[in-house]
Design a protein with these regions (language model features):
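TPR alpha-solenoid repeat register
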Residues: 45-46, 79, 113-115, 149
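Structural marker of alpha-solenoid helical repeat scaffolds
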Residues: 38-39, 72, 106-108, 142
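Alpha-helical segment of the N-proximal tetratricopeptide repeat
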Residues: 6-44, 48, 55
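Terminal, low-structured helical/coil segments at or just beyond the last alpha-helical repeat
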Residues: 1-6, 10, 121, 125, ...
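Residue-level recognition of tetratricopeptide repeat
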Residues: 9, 42-43, 76, 112, ...
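Structural signature of tandem alpha-helical TPR/SEL1-like repeats
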Residues: 22-32, 56-68, 90-105, 114, ...
Length: 161
């Protein structure tokens, strides 16, 4: 019973942290995420803590939080995608590819199209146009209502024709 109460409290804390993060209050968000993982570590809290840290340019710490999230729940796809994005931000495109691939394969991931979009961006930067096209097609197939994904796919098709 105590563990479920801890999990409930930890979830409340990371949800509050997420709200602070969306309002741009990063320090307050980070504090709440840290309190959440102190009560009961969850993959979500570690991932979102990493995300907040990344907005402060603290990419090594952000990556470490994502690795902790993966240890807790290897089926949660968000930390794989986030590590891929942090590597992209550092110009480490080849290193980002396997992380984004793992995010695509994860059982639990929302929004599902993000790793496809990010992998497509990697391939564009590498000049791998047809690989990028396949990824953007995968993004649109995964999330047909995503206007940004559809627009990106349309633009790339136009450039390739």
């Amino acid at each position: 019973m105590e563990e479920s109460e801890d999990l409930r409290r930890a979830t409340e804390l990371w949800r509050a942290a997420y709200r602070y993060q969306m309002e741009g209050e990063l320090d307050r968000a980070i504090e709440h995420y840290q309190r959440s993982v102190a009560v009961h570590p969850t993959a979500e809290a570690h991932t979102f803590l990493g995300w907040s840290l990344s907005f402060q340019g603290r990419l090594e710490e952000a990556t470490a939080e994502c690795l902790r999230a993966i240890e807790i729940d290897p089926d949660f796809g968000n930390p794989y995608n986030d590590i891929g994005v942090y590597l992209m931000q550092q110009g480490k495109l080849d290193e980002a590819i396997p992380w984004l691939g793992k995010a695509k394969q994860a059982r639990r991931y929302e929004p599902r199209q993000f790793p496809f979009m990010n992998l497509g961006r990697v391939y564009l930067k590498q000049g791998r146009w047809w690989d990028a096209l396949r990824e953007f097609e995968g993004a649109v197939q995964t999330a047909p209502g995503d206007v940004h994904a559809a627009k990106t796919l349309h633009q790339l098709r136009g450039q390739l024709n």
